[in-house]
Amino acid sequence: MRKTNLLIGLLFLSTSLWGQDPWKITVSDVRTDNYYGVTVGNGMLGIVSSPEPLRTNNVVLAGSYDKYGRGRVSNFLNGFNMLNGSISIDGNRINRNNISGFTQTLDMKKATFTSRFTYADKADITCSYLALRQLPYCAMMVVEVEPKADITIAAVNTQETPDAFRDGRMFYNEINRRHAAIKLLTTQAQSPTGRLTVCASSAFMFPEKAGEEPRVTHTTHNSNSHQTSFSRKLRKGETYRFCIVGSTLTSAHHPDPMNETERLTVFACLEGYDRLMVRHLSLWDDLWSSDIIIDGDAQAQQDIHNMIYHLYSFVREGSELSISPMGLSGLGYNGHVFWDADTWIFPALLMLKPQLAKSMIEYRYNRLQAAKENAFEHGFSGAMFPWESADSGFEETPVWALTGTFEHHITGCVAMAAWNYYRVTQDKTWLREKGYPILKATADFWLSRVEKDADGSTYHIRNVVAADEWAENVDDNAFTNGVAKQNLAAASQAAALL
């Protein structure tokens, strides 16, 4: 990875000024010419905002890779957009050009993204969405309409098969019970090479009792797009709320992704808005129980919250997945895991939320065998971790980049993350079962990697790409040698403890 500017910090929306609220970032000049988007995530699902009302730009699902695009290596998938809505008032569809007072706000404490705008003199509309923290594969959009006059609204929930996908199939399923009616909009497709089956399902969720909710209709546009819709008359001053709940899975996550996405959507619908929100907010309150507080500098406090928010949004307890430099904010760096995860991101999470950091080092442990095979291929002993890692644990760096072949300091970075996890948690069972196997295998790698002087007095590590990636095929890079020494010392200390 050629490092220019690592974006774990927020690339936000336009040229508007950042506010001083420690928890909220608001833009009031939403423009399309320099719009980057902001992500809400739950550590598994990342949803990137759009400058268009009731829409999102991208959906990224952690652990979903296929070999397509640049480099002949695995890439993150740009998945199904389950929160793809639109709304019309009195027959006129709302868009970016016919609304006023358009603002967008990221609430970092609540992990919600909210757009507010006014349509003519007819209604004020608020649209919020969130990646539900309690449900790793589910998201929810909440739309509130406050009429300024008697109006008729028509809302649409659309699913479109991404262009890179193939063999799309569309389904509509009605689940009717005495106490509930759920109209499921579902799409299934194959990833670009057919490696994965990718599915999404969504449904409207209404506040009315069963039998009193609006009638939902299903329409197919073409072989790649279908939708559900409803209409409802509203009186002046009668605030009305409806939701879109969506789920997405791939065959990398579940053996039967289509049925399971529908089950998860049904589960979320029958949990209901209030229970979904209470649980989501409670879990984010728990995350924010570990915070960094700065007195006297509101902008610095907002900046710190912005950084921590993205770390919490991109890593999930129990997932056994690590984090790409761009997290779940898009397809940058192909979604691959680099040394950034172990060296720069892991220490912060280890101090703030060790249970999140544990997922990152478990990701490495689960791919230890692949690292051993990588070392074997290169004529070394032990374990040699890949410079770019995805789902398999084998090297995913494009061939033209020498980093994948020679930037070996990554192995020491992984080892030090394992050792530091033990040092902070003092979990000796984990050290024995998972930490020490990493430390020993990586130490064995360095023992086979070093070369001794002719007189036997000095060891060298020759022919590496340095931590400065422009320094290619150099000898005795300071960082590489230093982390190798630390790795060997940590392995010895761990062995003595056990």
Residue ranges and their predicted role:
Residues 20-40, 44-333:
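Acidic/polar, glycine-enriched structural segments that form the non-catalytic walls/loops
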Residues 165, 313-319, 369-374, 446-453, ...:
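Secretory-pathway/luminal and periplasmic proteins that interact with or process carbohydrate-rich
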Residues 153, 252-259, 291-295, 351, ...:
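Inter-helical turn/loop segments and adjacent helix faces that build the functional surface
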Residues 306-313, 363-370, 437-449, 486, ...:
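Alpha-helical scaffold segments in carbohydrate-active enzymes
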Residues 329-337, 383-433, 441-498:
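The feature captures the catalytic groove of carbohydrate-active enzymes
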Residues 39-40, 47-48, 275-423:
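Substrate-binding groove/exosite segments of carbohydrate-active enzymes
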Residues 1-20:
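Bacterial Sec-dependent N-terminal signal peptides
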Residues 126-127, 156-157, 359-363, 376-377, ...:
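Beta-strand segments within the central parallel beta-sheet cores of soluble alpha/beta enzyme folds
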